[in-house]
Amino acid sequence: MLRTSRRRRIAATALAVGSIAVLAGCGTSGGSSTPTEAVDELGDYEGEVSIIAWAGYVEDGSNDPDYDWVSGFEEKTGCQVTSKTFNTSDEAVTLMKTGDYDVVSASGDASLRLIAAGDVQPVNVDLIPSYEGVYDFLKDQPWNTVDGEHYGVPHGYGANLLLYNTEVVTPAPTSWDVVFDKAGDYSGKITAYDNPIYIADAAVYLMTHQPDLGIENPYALDETQFQAAVDLLKEQRQHVGEYWSDYLKEIQAFETGDSVAGTTWQVIQNVLAGEGATTDVVLPDEGATGWSDTWMISSTTEHPNCSYAWLDWIASPEVNGVATSYFGEAPSSDAACDYREDCEAYHAGDADYASQIWYWTTPIAECLDGRTDVECMDYSAWTEAWSEIKG
């Protein structure tokens, strides 16, 4: 039985990617044995599979006996699961380079690095029955498909929303201006996500409020566009009471009143609402950044059959419904909503809602919006600028 309450142990989807130099500077970790094409058929299960994932993605009942989707997989396949959690995409990329793990749950900021370095292999989605039911708007996306080649199976997705104190921030906001141009109204009580990727949030805002900048993609910023986003965040800094990456700290800040407006995840609002806090969330008119995670298979795995079995299992309706509910995000299919009670809160399957989300993507010098007459600022520049923004 699923429950709508959210425990404070639900994992934060922290994002802290490193320099994009890894894309150009690293070869494959598997040498000549690295698969360049997806497999055509599967064989017998190997009896084990090693998985690295965000906390809350591979639950065996040890954290909460009501949430266990590992035991059923082991019983069905005979593949014994060992798992390790990571806290950042940087950590995930580093761990996959060791070749010690078979499967990884990768956010969009990590997936392309893994693909470019040859650390993950193409996936034959025809061998994964559950893939057929996955929402179309999660398939064939830049973070999971390259040159028509699939590299994994979508898991869950969500938007970075605007959280606000309903008693303090009135009328109810519909724009990100409450944390940018109007941040002075709540100076010292604005909160922002503590990561260089937050520069994209400023870029999303500027797409609407400074259209002359010509920003078409918040992860594809030339020097002028990038500087405008950085300047906006430097102006915001004087009004920020706390930069957060630990979701528990944001919950506490809104409970105590230390924060009254800022970026958040739906799961944080769920926890606050469950505890009676006077808060609400909105996806502002300008749109928002967000995430879409992908299950991927190591290019050097010695357990491809168990790995494929996991990708099919975790995308199956009941398991995906339970797993994404536990974590606090929308599932990957309509069928998964039959096994959870809160799909409406997460706008699951709402393509129009999803179209307002700019999913996390690693910025690179080759502009992701297709421009070839300029060079865009890569993630190393974003990282350097973030240090300057915070001071």
Where are these regions (language model features)?
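C-terminal motif of bacterial Sec signal peptides marking the signal peptidase cleavage site
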Residues: A21-G25
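Periplasmic-binding protein-like
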Residues: E132-G133, V230-Q236, E275-M296
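Mature extracytoplasmic/periplasmic domains
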Residues: T289, S298-A365
